[in-house]
């Protein structure tokens, strides 16, 4: 589960307790700025405490959902975003996570698209180099105006060309991803780089059964992370979500 947004008001203890109680949930992505307060400014002692708490639980701390983005035409802005990303890499290493999620958010109109793609790829490669030294992967979310096009994301990771640079499939319902009711073409395009998966409400027209089948066929053995809007009854929502996920996942 992603703490965005059902779990956003819970601290670490509550997140672990509620996910264990709901059953089926095995991992969590801690989105920055949420109530868990596991951020790059916490102390070494607190990092150790967080790591040990997750290690004692049934819930894996999978990654940190950052808002680092590298599409700005301004090199100084991109440099600062990479530096923020490094801090999250250190946090992920110290707390036992697998990776961090970053994102593109747009193709600025004042520069050619190929320039922005190159900027994002260069920043990804730089951050992946840093992550490799700490065993932390960098996952680019298929996200943002124009940049959520699977073809754009594929080109970014091709140019980044780094073992520690991968993609976070984001289950976007738009026509760039879903073609004639199917995500097969988009999935096959991005398949070599998919390291992390976001799924959303499930109760919509997105081809969930097909996606889960494609993931099984690809031997994807990581997590499909619930990313849903907040609920006034979060515990009830988790139980409902668990049941729907199980049904849609049936072979």
Where are these regions (language model features)?
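A cross-family glycoside hydrolase active-site/sugar-binding cleft signature
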Residues: 2-4, 29-31, 62-67, 101-103, ...
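Histidine-acidic metal/acid-base catalytic patches
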Residues: 3, 7-26, 147-251
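A generic secondary-structure micro-motif detector
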Residues: 5-6, 39-40, 78, 117, ...
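Active-site acidic/histidine proton-transfer and metal-coordination neighborhood
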Residues: 11-20, 51-63, 70-169, 176
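A short beta-strand-loop structural module common to alpha/beta enzyme folds
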Residues: 26-37
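Positions that flank functional sites
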Residues: 33-35, 69, 107, 146, ...
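Glycine-rich, positively charged N-terminal anion/phosphate-binding segment
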Residues: 39-53
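Residue-level preference for long, well-ordered alpha-helices that form the structural scaffold
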Residues: 43-46, 74-77, 81, 113-116, ...
């Amino acid at each position: 589960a992603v703490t965005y947004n059902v779990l956003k008001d819970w601290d670490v203890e509550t997140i672990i307790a509620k996910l264990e109680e709901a059953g089926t949930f095995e991992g969590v992505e801690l989105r920055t700025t949420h109530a868990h307060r596991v951020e790059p400014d916490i102390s070494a002692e607190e990092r150790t405490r967080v790591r040990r708490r997750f290690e004692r639980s049934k819930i894996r701390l999978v990654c940190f959902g950052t808002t680092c983005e590298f599409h700005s035409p301004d090199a100084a802005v991109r440099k600062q975003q990479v530096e923020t990303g490094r801090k999250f890499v250190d946090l992920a290493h110290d707390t036992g996570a697998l990776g961090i999620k970053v994102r593109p958010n747009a193709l600025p109109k004042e520069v050619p698209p190929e320039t922005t793609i190159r900027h994002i790829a260069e920043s990804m490669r730089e951050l992946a180099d840093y992550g490799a030294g700490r065993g932390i992967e960098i996952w680019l979310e298929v996200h943002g105006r124009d940049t959520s096009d699977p073809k754009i994301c594929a080109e970014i990771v091709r140019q980044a060309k780094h073992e520690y640079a991968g993609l976070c499939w984001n289950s976007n319902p738009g026509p760039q991803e879903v073609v004639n009711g199917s995500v097969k073409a988009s999935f096959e395009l991005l398949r070599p780089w998919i390291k992390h998966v976001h799924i959303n409400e499930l109760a919509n027209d997105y081809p969930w059964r097909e996606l889960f089948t494609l993931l099984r066929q690809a031997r994807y053995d990581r997590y499909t992370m619930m990313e849903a809007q907040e609920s006034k009854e979060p515990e009830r929502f988790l139980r409902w979500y668990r049941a729907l996920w199980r049904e849609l996942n049936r072979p």
